From Swiss-Prot:
Chain's gene name: cutC
Name assigned to this protein: PF03932 family protein CutC
CC terms in the record's Gene Ontology section: cytoplasm
GO molecular function, one term: copper ion binding
Entries under InterPro entries matching the protein: CutC-like (IPR005627), CutC-like_dom_sf (IPR036822)
Family named by the database record: Belongs to the CutC family.
Subcellular location: Cytoplasm
Major localization class: cytoplasm
């Protein structure tokens, strides 16, 4: 059966996504950074309030996926905490300076997360050789790979995604980045069995007073009086499309 994972930047969004029919949650913070590790409070709340599988992302900062020794120590601490909290899986990815999987560190990750589902996130889309990387990830025992097919959007990356599905002898290939209700059928037709989407909308702040000329972000064009939230209607519609589709085959 096809699975719909919703990327959520807060616990309220995760609750909304579950009620709308999501199969799994990727829990993050910091949407402007592409997703960072959620706070301890968010993790605790998610464990208490969400019944479907929640996989927190382990990513200490934005930018690339080649981490310093101190950053990796922080990541290991986060993995241990996430496991202690009882989460069934996590989302992570590490590359070396040459764009290959950091296999030494990923082996440590797999040891620390033993018994959990591990998703190798879109660090995969920045790797040097995707087919070799997939084989290395399979050898590590990673459960799935989240990928846009090394393109800005998964729709543009469908040729590589199809090839990865054909050649994968282990990890599930999950398409993500620009996966929407409007293009969902293309992924179904390509035989993709797991889809990752934010299914989001911008929601205006409830604040009446809005101080002009002052921003908490160096990117001054960012609207700080709105935020990204899950759209329940979109999640429900996407799930209905997936449930109505026949079992996939690679086109």
């Amino acid at each position: 059966m096809r699975q719909l994972e919703i990327c959520c930047y807060g616990v309220e969004c995760a609750v909304t996504a579950e009620r709308a029919g999501a199969d799994r949650i990727e829990l993050c913070s910091a949407p402007a950074e592409g997703g960072l590790t959620p706070s301890a409070g968010a993790l605790d709340s998610a464990r208490r309030r969400v019944s479907i599988p929640v996989h927190p992302i382990v990513r200490p900062r934005g930018g690339d996926f080649c981490y310093s020794p101190s950053e990796f120590e922080l990541m290991k601490s986060d993995i241990s905490f996430i496991r202690e909290q009882g989460f069934p899986g996590l989302v992570i990815g590490l590359l070396d300076v040459d764009g290959h999987v950091d296999q030494r560190r990923m082996r440590q990750v797999m040891q620390l997360s033993q018994g959990m589902d591990v998703t190798f996130h879109r660090a995969f889309d920045l790797c040097h050789n995707p087919l070799l990387t997939m084989a290395q990830i399979a050898d590590l025992g990673v459960t799935r790979i989240l990928t846009s097919g090394q393109q800005q959007s998964a729709e543009s990356g469908l040729p590589l995604i199809r090839e990865l599905i054909r050649q994968s002898n282990g990890p599930m290939i999950m398409a993500g980045a620009g996966v929407r209700l409007s293009n969902l059928q293309k992924f179904i037709d390509a035989g993709v069995m797991e889809l990752h989407s934010s299914a989001s909308q911008r929601v205006s702040s409830t604040m009446r007073y809005r101080k002009a000329g002052v921003s908490m972000c160096s990117e001054t064009e960012v609207d700080e009086f709105s935020r990204t939230c899950v759209d329940a209607d979109v999640v429900a519609a996407m799930k209905n499309v997936l449930m109505a589709a026949s079992p996939g085959r690679v086109a």
